[in-house]
């Protein structure tokens, strides 16, 4: 008997005995898994991709994989703010990592875990869920203060441990960041993600008096690219695959697009700079990223094991997301912060017992801004009227259902992108545009915005973007 049928049977019995249905229905638990900087170059999306993610695939087999899931903003703070508050950047005014005006709203601002707490849940968490606070140590207290009954802070890339030579262990010096940003710890137990998952495992092994909202924020594969040595054995440097990087790729890109690509140009330029001394420096960086992403996947596996062992899987909603993607040398970028596909396309999976069909796939473009209202509906909680997103439950029930809500991405005020099943349309604050045909150009090498034969396509996408942005 499925979890949904059990709840229906229990409800019927309670009604016959005179107990209200609301009291009879068992609220589902929520396992909320965040991953930092995980792009789409994984086996979750294509078995031929180099980054091995068997546990993401294991999770997708239980529910619905959104093959076109996108962040609202390709930056840690604004993306997480959108997810955790339900407000997109046009509402929150959180466009960049340095923007924190949203917290000035005070009591009127109700975060996602806080909303669950207000409706009878216990909310606990660990790791990186909100963006880091002052000094980069721990989640922003303005987000955590009212959100959790208990929270174990994210305290950095790893616990205190030995410092290894960055060049010898994977990358040449990049400014003053060599040893701290491009090597890895020798022992898994020194990884902060180990602590995060261990906390979640302990919570899942406990007896609960209330339904639980449990969040686990996995920091990898965010810089620094640490992973246990045994993980690197799966990614030998001689087999490291680089993304395609045609020369002069940015020649047809507007100035603002180039500037966004080079937001942290020191990373890309220093990798190239060191090539005469180490021709494989870019390969080493990509190798380190791949190993870090693989390690993050293994942490997801441990979370699923703990949930299964707890016996609560049939009554637990699971949502997994990455805050944004990541460039690995493509588009002259080794970070995020652009409006191109690789910086915005992310793993996004929802498992909702009794609602999602195991192994289902939804190809509709959607954004993570929809997580807040979706979890409320799945949990039977009243909707929050001022959410900017929309519940994905219709797509969870039927992945081919009509979905009229456009997938909009923003990077900085006035710079927006619209993704459809075929097109990525970008418009910057100065009016300059880009258009890419993903049916024929998945790496976005040819900007079609200046091609008159695509005038009708651009006009239609421009109108959709105008309507979507004007609503905020």
What are these regions (language model features)?
Residues 2, 22-23:
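Glycine-centered signal
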Residues 1-10:
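Bacterial N-terminal signal peptides that target proteins for export
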Residues 10, 15, 23-428, 432-433, ...:
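Formylglycine-dependent sulfatase
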């Amino acid at each position: 008997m499925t979890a949904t049928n059990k709840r229906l049977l229990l409800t019927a019995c309670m009604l016959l005995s005179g107990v209200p249905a609301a009291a009879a229905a068992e609220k589902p638990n929520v396992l909320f898994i965040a991953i930092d900087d995980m792009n789409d170059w994984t086996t979750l999306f294509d078995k031929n991709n180099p980054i091995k993610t068997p546990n993401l695939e294991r999770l997708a087999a239980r529910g619905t994989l959104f093959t076109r899931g996108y962040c609202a903003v390709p930056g840690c703070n604004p993306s997480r703010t959108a997810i955790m508050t339900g407000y997109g950047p046009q509402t929150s005014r959180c466009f960049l990592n340095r923007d924190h005006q949203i917290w000035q709203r005070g009591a009127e601002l109700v975060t996602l875990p806080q909303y669950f707490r207000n409706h009878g849940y216990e909310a606990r968490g660990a790791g990186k869920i909100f963006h880091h606070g002052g000094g980069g140590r721990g989640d922003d207290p303005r987000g955590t203060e009212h959100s959790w009954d208990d929270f174990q802070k994210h305290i950095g890339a790893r616990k205190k441990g030995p410092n290894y030579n960055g060049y010898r262990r994977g990358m040449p010096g990049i400014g003053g960041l060599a040893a701290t940003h491009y090597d890895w710890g020798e022992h898994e137990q020194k990884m902060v993600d180990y602590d995060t998952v261990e906390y979640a495992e302990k919570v899942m092994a406990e007896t609960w008096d209330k339904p639980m909202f449990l969040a686990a924020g996995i920091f990898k594969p965010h810089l620094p690219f640490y992973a246990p040595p045994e993980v690197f054995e799966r990614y030998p440097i001689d087999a490291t695959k680089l993304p395609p990087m045609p020369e002069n790729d940015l020649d047809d890109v507007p100035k603002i697009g180039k500037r966004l690509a080079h937001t942290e140009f020191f990373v890309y330029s220093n990798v190239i700079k060191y090539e005469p001394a180490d021709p494989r420096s870019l390969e080493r960086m990509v190798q380190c990223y791949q190993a870090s992403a693989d390690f993050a996947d293994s942490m997801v596996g441990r979370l699923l094991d703990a949930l299964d062992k707890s016996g609560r899987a049939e009554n637990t909603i699971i949502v997994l997301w990455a805050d944004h993607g990541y460039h690995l040398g493509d588009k002259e970028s080794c970070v995020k912060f652009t409006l191109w596909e690789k910086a915005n396309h992310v793993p996004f999976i929802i498992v909702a017992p009794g609602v999602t069909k195991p192994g289902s796939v939804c190809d509709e473009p959607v954004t993570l801004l929809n997580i807040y209202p979706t979890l409320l509906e799945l949990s039977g909680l009243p909707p929050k009227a001022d959410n900017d997103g929309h519940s994905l439950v219709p797509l969870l029930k039927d992945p081919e259902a009509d979905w009229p809500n456009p997938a909009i991405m923003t990077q900085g005020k006035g710079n927006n992108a619209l993704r459809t099943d075929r097109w990525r349309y970008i418009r910057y604050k100065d009016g300059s545009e880009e258009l890419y045909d993903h049916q024929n150009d998945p790496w976005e090498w040819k900007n079609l915005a200046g091609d008159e034969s695509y005038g009708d396509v651009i006009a239609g996408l421009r109108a959709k973007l105008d309507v979507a942005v004007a609503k905020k």
